[in-house]
Protein backbone atom coordinates (compact mmCIF):
# COMPACT_ATOMS: atom_id res chain seq x y z
CA UNK A 1 0.00 0.00 0.00
CA UNK A 2 1.32 3.43 -0.90
CA UNK A 3 2.31 5.72 1.96
CA UNK A 4 0.01 8.69 2.22
CA UNK A 5 1.69 12.07 2.45
CA UNK A 6 0.54 14.84 4.77
CA UNK A 7 -0.79 16.78 1.77
CA UNK A 8 -2.82 13.84 0.46
CA UNK A 9 -4.30 13.19 3.89
CA UNK A 10 -5.60 16.75 4.06
CA UNK A 11 -6.62 16.91 0.39
CA UNK A 12 -7.47 13.38 -0.81
CA UNK A 13 -7.26 12.59 -4.51
CA UNK A 14 -10.98 11.93 -4.75
CA UNK A 15 -11.63 15.58 -3.83
CA UNK A 16 -9.57 16.81 -6.77
CA UNK A 17 -11.59 18.07 -9.76
CA UNK A 18 -12.23 15.38 -12.35
CA UNK A 19 -11.42 16.98 -15.68
CA UNK A 20 -13.09 15.09 -18.49
CA UNK A 21 -12.71 16.05 -22.13
CA UNK A 22 -13.82 14.48 -25.39
CA UNK A 23 -10.66 15.53 -27.24
CA UNK A 24 -6.97 15.18 -26.61
CA UNK A 25 -5.68 18.57 -27.78
CA UNK A 26 -7.50 21.88 -27.44
CA UNK A 27 -5.58 23.25 -30.45
CA UNK A 28 -6.65 20.32 -32.61
CA UNK A 29 -10.24 19.25 -31.80
CA UNK A 30 -9.93 16.26 -34.09
CA UNK A 31 -7.21 14.68 -32.00
CA UNK A 32 -8.43 11.67 -29.99
CA UNK A 33 -7.95 11.63 -26.26
CA UNK A 34 -4.61 10.16 -25.18
CA UNK A 35 -4.29 6.98 -23.15
CA UNK A 36 -2.80 8.94 -20.26
CA UNK A 37 -5.79 11.30 -20.23
CA UNK A 38 -8.23 8.42 -20.18
CA UNK A 39 -6.24 6.69 -17.44
CA UNK A 40 -6.24 9.83 -15.25
CA UNK A 41 -10.00 10.23 -15.65
CA UNK A 42 -10.70 6.56 -14.90
CA UNK A 43 -8.39 6.60 -11.86
CA UNK A 44 -9.98 9.76 -10.47
CA UNK A 45 -13.47 8.31 -10.79
CA UNK A 46 -12.36 4.97 -9.31
CA UNK A 47 -10.91 6.82 -6.30
CA UNK A 48 -14.18 8.68 -5.92
CA UNK A 49 -16.15 5.43 -6.09
CA UNK A 50 -13.86 3.79 -3.52
CA UNK A 51 -14.31 6.75 -1.17
CA UNK A 52 -18.09 6.47 -1.50
CA UNK A 53 -18.06 2.72 -0.84
CA UNK A 54 -16.01 3.29 2.33
CA UNK A 55 -18.44 5.82 3.80
CA UNK A 56 -20.52 4.90 6.86
CA UNK A 57 -24.13 4.16 5.95
CA UNK A 58 -25.48 7.38 7.46
CA UNK A 59 -23.03 9.52 5.50
CA UNK A 60 -23.59 7.66 2.24
CA UNK A 61 -27.30 8.44 2.56
CA UNK A 62 -26.46 12.17 2.53
CA UNK A 63 -24.62 12.03 -0.81
CA UNK A 64 -26.70 12.96 -3.88
CA UNK A 65 -26.48 9.80 -5.98
CA UNK A 66 -28.53 8.23 -8.78
CA UNK A 67 -30.48 5.29 -7.38
CA UNK A 68 -28.61 2.75 -9.51
CA UNK A 69 -25.27 3.95 -8.16
CA UNK A 70 -26.53 4.10 -4.57
CA UNK A 71 -27.82 0.51 -4.89
CA UNK A 72 -24.51 -0.65 -6.37
CA UNK A 73 -22.56 0.93 -3.51
CA UNK A 74 -24.82 -0.67 -0.91
CA UNK A 75 -24.38 -4.02 -2.62
CA UNK A 76 -20.59 -3.59 -2.64
CA UNK A 77 -20.65 -3.12 1.13
CA UNK A 78 -22.39 -6.49 1.51
CA UNK A 79 -19.92 -8.44 -0.64
CA UNK A 80 -17.18 -10.16 1.34
CA UNK A 81 -15.25 -12.08 -1.33
CA UNK A 82 -12.29 -10.28 -2.87
CA UNK A 83 -13.17 -11.20 -6.45
CA UNK A 84 -16.84 -10.33 -5.98
CA UNK A 85 -15.90 -6.95 -4.50
CA UNK A 86 -13.49 -6.30 -7.38
CA UNK A 87 -16.17 -6.97 -10.00
CA UNK A 88 -18.69 -4.84 -8.15
CA UNK A 89 -16.24 -1.93 -7.91
CA UNK A 90 -15.63 -2.23 -11.65
CA UNK A 91 -19.38 -1.91 -12.16
CA UNK A 92 -19.45 1.10 -9.84
CA UNK A 93 -16.64 2.64 -11.90
CA UNK A 94 -18.73 2.18 -15.03
CA UNK A 95 -21.68 3.92 -13.37
CA UNK A 96 -19.38 6.71 -12.17
CA UNK A 97 -18.20 7.35 -15.73
CA UNK A 98 -21.82 7.84 -16.79
CA UNK A 99 -22.29 10.72 -14.35
CA UNK A 100 -22.33 14.30 -15.55
CA UNK A 101 -19.71 16.80 -14.42
CA UNK A 102 -22.38 18.49 -12.27
CA UNK A 103 -23.20 15.16 -10.60
CA UNK A 104 -19.53 14.56 -9.80
CA UNK A 105 -19.03 18.06 -8.44
CA UNK A 106 -22.09 17.71 -6.18
CA UNK A 107 -20.69 14.44 -4.80
CA UNK A 108 -17.28 15.99 -4.22
CA UNK A 109 -18.78 18.94 -2.33
CA UNK A 110 -20.56 16.63 0.12
CA UNK A 111 -17.45 14.49 0.60
CA UNK A 112 -15.43 17.64 1.29
CA UNK A 113 -17.76 18.53 4.17
CA UNK A 114 -17.18 15.05 5.64
CA UNK A 115 -13.41 15.51 5.43
CA UNK A 116 -13.70 18.91 7.12
CA UNK A 117 -15.82 17.48 9.92
CA UNK A 118 -13.34 14.63 10.45
CA UNK A 119 -10.42 17.07 10.63
CA UNK A 120 -12.28 19.17 13.20
CA UNK A 121 -13.00 16.10 15.33
CA UNK A 122 -9.37 15.00 15.12
CA UNK A 123 -8.21 18.46 16.22
CA UNK A 124 -10.64 18.35 19.16
CA UNK A 125 -9.35 14.96 20.31
CA UNK A 126 -5.77 16.19 20.07
CA UNK A 127 -6.67 19.20 22.23
CA UNK A 128 -8.14 16.87 24.86
CA UNK A 129 -5.03 14.68 24.80
CA UNK A 130 -2.76 17.70 25.18
CA UNK A 131 -4.70 18.94 28.21
CA UNK A 132 -4.64 15.50 29.82
CA UNK A 133 -0.88 15.18 29.28
CA UNK A 134 -0.28 18.64 30.71
CA UNK A 135 -2.45 17.92 33.74
CA UNK A 136 -0.49 14.75 34.44
CA UNK A 137 2.87 16.47 33.99
CA UNK A 138 2.39 19.80 35.75
CA UNK A 139 0.39 20.93 38.79
CA UNK A 140 0.32 24.42 37.34
CA UNK A 141 -1.75 23.10 34.45
CA UNK A 142 -4.49 22.13 36.92
CA UNK A 143 -4.84 25.74 38.05
CA UNK A 144 -4.82 26.91 34.43
CA UNK A 145 -7.46 24.37 33.43
CA UNK A 146 -9.75 25.29 36.31
CA UNK A 147 -9.42 28.99 35.45
CA UNK A 148 -10.36 28.26 31.83
CA UNK A 149 -13.21 25.93 32.84
CA UNK A 150 -14.64 27.25 36.13
CA UNK A 151 -17.51 24.74 36.20
CA UNK A 152 -15.03 21.88 36.62
CA UNK A 153 -15.36 19.73 39.75
CA UNK A 154 -11.99 20.70 41.21
CA UNK A 155 -11.78 17.93 43.80
CA UNK A 156 -12.73 15.23 41.30
CA UNK A 157 -10.19 16.57 38.79
CA UNK A 158 -7.36 16.59 41.34
CA UNK A 159 -8.28 13.06 42.45
CA UNK A 160 -8.20 11.76 38.88
CA UNK A 161 -4.83 13.41 38.25
CA UNK A 162 -3.38 11.99 41.46
CA UNK A 163 -4.69 8.48 40.77
CA UNK A 164 -3.54 8.55 37.14
CA UNK A 165 -0.03 9.55 38.19
CA UNK A 166 0.05 6.77 40.77
CA UNK A 167 -1.13 4.20 38.22
CA UNK A 168 1.63 5.27 35.84
CA UNK A 169 4.28 4.99 38.55
CA UNK A 170 3.10 1.51 39.54
CA UNK A 171 2.68 0.32 35.96
CA UNK A 172 -1.03 -0.33 36.45
CA UNK A 173 -3.69 -0.13 33.70
CA UNK A 174 -4.46 3.56 32.98
CA UNK A 175 -8.05 3.53 34.26
CA UNK A 176 -7.83 6.96 35.89
CA UNK A 177 -6.04 8.38 32.85
CA UNK A 178 -8.95 7.32 30.66
CA UNK A 179 -11.40 8.82 33.15
CA UNK A 180 -9.36 12.03 33.14
CA UNK A 181 -9.60 12.12 29.34
CA UNK A 182 -13.39 11.89 29.59
CA UNK A 183 -13.49 14.59 32.28
CA UNK A 184 -11.45 16.95 30.10
CA UNK A 185 -13.63 16.08 27.11
CA UNK A 186 -16.80 16.97 29.03
CA UNK A 187 -15.29 20.21 30.31
CA UNK A 188 -14.26 21.30 26.81
CA UNK A 189 -17.66 20.31 25.40
CA UNK A 190 -19.38 22.34 28.11
CA UNK A 191 -17.16 25.32 27.30
CA UNK A 192 -18.02 25.07 23.59
CA UNK A 193 -21.74 24.74 24.35
CA UNK A 194 -21.63 27.78 26.63
CA UNK A 195 -20.14 29.77 23.77
CA UNK A 196 -22.87 28.61 21.41
CA UNK A 197 -25.59 29.41 23.93
CA UNK A 198 -24.23 32.94 24.27
CA UNK A 199 -24.39 33.64 20.55
CA UNK A 200 -28.17 34.23 20.23
CA UNK A 201 -28.12 36.90 22.94
CA UNK A 202 -25.26 38.64 21.15
CA UNK A 203 -27.24 38.61 17.94
CA UNK A 204 -30.23 40.07 19.72
CA UNK A 205 -28.05 42.84 21.14
CA UNK A 206 -26.79 43.62 17.65
CA UNK A 207 -30.32 43.77 16.31
CA UNK A 208 -31.61 45.96 19.16
Swiss-Prot record:
Localization terms from the record: Cytoplasm
Recorded GO MF terms: ribosome binding; rRNA binding
Record keywords: Cytoplasm, Ribosome biogenesis, RNA-binding, rRNA-binding
Gene: darP
Transmembrane segments: none
Keyword Zinc appears in the UniProt entry: no
Function, as annotated: Member of a network of 50S ribosomal subunit biogenesis factors which assembles along the 30S-50S interface, preventing incorrect 23S rRNA structures from forming. Promotes peptidyl transferase center (PTC) maturation.
A GO cellular component entry from the record: cytosol
UniProt cross-references to InterPro entries, sorted A to Z: DarP, DarP_sf
Database matches in Gene3D superfamilies: PSPTO4464-like domains (1.10.60.30)
Organism domain of life: Bacteria
Family named by the database record: Belongs to the DarP family.
Name of the protein: Dual-action ribosomal maturation protein DarP
Segments for region (Disordered): 1-41, 167-208
Comp. bias intervals (Acidic residues): 195-208
Keyword rRNA-binding: yes
Organism: Ralstonia nicotianae (strain ATCC BAA-1114 / GMI1000) (Ralstonia solanacearum)
Disulphide bond pairs: none
Top-level taxonomy: Bacteria, Pseudomonadati, Pseudomonadota, Betaproteobacteria, Burkholderiales
Single GO biological process annotation from the record: assembly of large subunit precursor of preribosome
Amino acid sequence: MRAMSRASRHNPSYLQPVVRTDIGDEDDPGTPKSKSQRKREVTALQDLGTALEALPKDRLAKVPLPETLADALREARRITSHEGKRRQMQYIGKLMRALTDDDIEAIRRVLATFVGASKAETARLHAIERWRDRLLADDGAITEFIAAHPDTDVQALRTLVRNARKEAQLGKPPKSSRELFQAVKQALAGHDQAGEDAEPSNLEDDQA
